[in-house]
Curated annotation (Swiss-Prot):
This is UPF0291 protein BLi02035/BL02933. GO terms for cellular component: cytoplasm. Its main location: cytoplasm. It comes from Bacillus licheniformis (strain ATCC 14580 / DSM 13 / JCM 2505 / CCUG 7422 / NBRC 12200 / NCIMB 9375 / NCTC 10341 / NRRL NRS-1264 / Gibson 46). It is found in: Cytoplasm.
Length: 77
């Protein structure tokens, strides 16, 4: 995940952008930090989904086969 310092910098740049005073370097930095943040969020979400089992109202496991395979592969490593 992304560090607290980087999140603080993202917020700082966002506030500065609202006032309309970002330089080109700061805009580039903001984009880079946002992408890094999103990658962390996506990775976290994927890990969370890999632990989920989907069950229908009747109690049957209806987890998609692709997700089941990911779980099996994860246990092997």
């Amino acid at each position: 995940m992304i560090s607290k310092e980087k999140i603080a910098r993202i917020n700082e740049l966002a506030k500065k952008a609202k006032s309309g005073s970002l330089t080109d370097e700061e805009k580039a930095e903001q984009q880079k930090l946002r992408q890094e943040y999103l990658q962390g969020v996506r990775a976290s979400m994927k890990n969370t989904l890999k632990t989920v089992t989907i069950v229908d109202p009747e109690g049957n496991d209806v987890t998609p086969e692709k997700l089941k395979q990911e779980k099996r592969n994860r246990r092997l490593h």
